């Protein structure tokens, strides 16, 4: 552990949020991986570790040979102040390495209230906020989750967004990214190729047009991007990996119990709800 971190932890609430080392966390040999991904949840540890979607995707991406997915959470106010005062950048729990050193920085956007935390985490990591200010392929800043169904509010900040469910498309994007790294592709070439994957939205490839009242009128696609991105849906949940040995938190979390996904979707079909546009509930066997 960074000695600077050891000095500040006694001065913050719930230091176990920031130490890692939990039972069943996934540790890999850096010499045996060629793609490192910082999986960022834009809220505090207790909320992020209660999120079953994050647990599923963390385990799924770590199933890929040569890929190491590590967790990153937003610090509470006291810890953020101490980190900024001590010059400690945002870091991953598993290795303690700065987020800026990772190949891919991926955010889970479950709700719009997390948007400010995303920008704060990027700033704390020392990563330029806007995609246009990050011309290199790495770090690639991406996002997925329910809130990406309305991508335009955060479009200037992400290089790539996942629309729909991530178990399959995440792995496809990571496989393409590894190919791009090995072949020395430019960021633009990678994004143009990634735009052909179902469920992938490249925000910079769409020019927004606004109404006089400030609302969005339409988007003009560029770089050969599709006019409409079709979201990815997992039709057979049993065909996807599901973690049976999740990480055991070292401190109390919001849902301090075992979470099991029995089905995905909703039978109600309320027209005002995003789930109305998703398939009827799909059960796990």
Task: Label each residue range with its predicted role.
Residues 41-45, 111, 264:
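Residue-level signal for short, function-critical loop segments
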Residues 74-221:
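Glycine-rich beta-alpha loop elements in corrinoid/cobalamin-binding modules
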Residues 264-275:
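Local cysteine-cluster metal-coordination motifs and their immediate loop/turn environment
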Residues 276-285:
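Single conserved hydrophobic/aromatic residue that forms the stacking wall/gate
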